[in-house]
């Protein structure tokens, strides 16, 4: 499946003389991550994530763990937090918990963000500076994935297990109820063959609503898939209402 990423763009403007007016381009700089989520085992010593620079120039890689509302989380550090990664090269970053108490009976959720920072004119760390003289606009992409904190007493998620999500109708809306201590990402959901807009991540024992199209039946068949620890999709699940 397509990697699940939250992408934010930061724009960097560069002065450009008339000589290079015809060479103005927009180029994105991002890091390619080796997974769509990281499962952090709270009884472990940290987790690693592969990071690749697909560009033809070096970039800076800046990584951090965030809370809801895009606030920095001091309970986790990423090492190295900022480093140069040469063109077409890849390496690992390490996520380590240094503080914090988290529930032992269910998963918790954070966000891991990795930004690719493009070279600027005058940067001593950048090579081949001439390649960027004619460039007016560089776009720095901040790629964010789920960092799921899993207590040691919870086994690996079995995405094909039955009875994990219960469905119902409430006030004309479809209700999804998570009956497990795991976080679920629901994809390819439909009701009586009509596609449904996924309401984001469904937390442990949480309920969320799907808005149903008007004039739709209040009973029928729900189909959906969930995403596993490695980013794989489950078998198609079914629930009759």
Swiss-Prot record:
Q: Which cysteines are joined by disulfide bonds?
A: 113-144
| Gene3D superfamilies (UniProt xref) | Immunoglobulins
Instruction: Output the SUPFAM superfamilies linked to this UniProt entry.
Output: PapD-like, Periplasmic chaperone C-domain
Which keywords does the record carry?
Chaperone, Disulfide bond, Fimbrium biogenesis, Immunoglobulin domain, Periplasm, Signal
Cell location: Periplasm
Q: What is its main location?
A: periplasm
Fetch the Pfam families from UniProt. Answer: PapD_C (PF02753), PapD_N (PF00345)
Signal peptide segment: 1-21
Database matches in InterPro entries: Ig-like_fold, PapD-like_sf, Periplasmic_pilus_chap, Pili_assmbl_chap_C_dom_sf, Pili_assmbl_chaperone_bac, Pili_assmbl_chaperone_C, Pili_assmbl_chaperone_CS, Pili_assmbl_chaperone_N
GO terms for biological process, alphabetical: cell wall organization; chaperone-mediated protein folding
The record's GO CC annotations read: outer membrane-bounded periplasmic space
Q: Specify the domain of life of the species encoding this protein.
A: Bacteria
Q: Which family does it belong to?
A: Belongs to the periplasmic pilus chaperone family.
What does the UniProt record say this protein does?
A: This protein is essential for the biogenesis of mature CS3 pili.
UniProt-recorded name of the protein: Chaperone protein CS3-1
